């Protein structure tokens, strides 16, 4: 399949992971310029591994101010965004032993950052008739012993994706999810 994204701008949150790097590679191969947003400084090396068209912005996606600054940087260096891939997540999960703070942190990173980044890029995506791809996981549907936070947050993203798709359709924004099987992502 030959996909042409020449001149389009894509944002990949969580782009410093193995899956994130593969997503960035696919987007670049299709001609897109890509902004990697990740708290992990390894994203810089990933961005530098491409000859051109990829930038890294170290971003704490639990901070609205950091998200808005990242969007401003993207606009300044790459332009308006047509595609958003929400891949950032934490694997913090001690099942039943997880504290309230663990729950709040996991949901903030895995779920709320998806909402806030989508909200911050909404006007671009509407103008560009763009797309959002939210990464869920097989864990959203398959129970795992000792894991509560990650599967619950990924199941919530599945439902969020359906709600976003319905609400954003009238604005020409497509919203879908991808649910990888078991894989190492770091």
Annotate each PLM feature.
Residues 98, 143-151, 163:
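Active-site loop-to-helix junction immediately N-terminal to the catalytic Tyr of the SDR YXXXK motif
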Residues 87-92:
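Conserved NAD(P)H cofactor-binding loop of Rossmann-fold oxidoreductase domains
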Residues 94-107:
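Substrate-binding pocket helix/loop in short-chain dehydrogenase/reductase
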Residues 123, 166-167:
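Alpha-helical segment proximal to the catalytic Tyr-Lys
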Residues 3-35:
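Canonical Rossmann dinucleotide-binding motif of NAD(H)/NADP(H)-dependent dehydrogenases/reductases
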Residues 118, 153, 161:
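Active-site helix of classical SDR
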Residues 137:
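Residue(s) in the substrate-gating loop at a strand-loop-helix junction
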């Amino acid at each position: 399949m030959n996909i042409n994204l020449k001149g389009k701008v894509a944002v990949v949150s969580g782009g410093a992971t193995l899956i994130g790097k593969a997503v960035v590679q696919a987007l670049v191969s299709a001609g897109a310029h890509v902004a990697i947003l990740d708290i992990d400084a390894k994203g810089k090396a990933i961005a530098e591994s491409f000859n051109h068209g990829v930038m890294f912005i170290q971003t704490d996606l639990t901070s609205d101010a950091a998200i808005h600054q990242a969007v401003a940087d993207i606009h300044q260096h790459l332009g308006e965004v047509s595609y958003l891939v929400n891949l950032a997540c934490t694997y913090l999960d001690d099942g039943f032993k997880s504290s309230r703070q663990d729950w709040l942190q996991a949901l903030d990173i895995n779920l709320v950052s998806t909402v806030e980044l989508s909200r911050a890029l909404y006007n671009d995506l509407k103008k560009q008739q763009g797309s959002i791809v939210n990464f869920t996981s097989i864990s959203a549907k398959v129970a795992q012993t000792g894991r509560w936070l990650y599967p619950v947050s990924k199941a919530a993203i599945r439902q969020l994706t359906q709600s976003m798709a319905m609400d954003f359709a009238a604005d020409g924004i497509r919203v879908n999810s991808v649910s990888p099987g078991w894989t190492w992502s770091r």
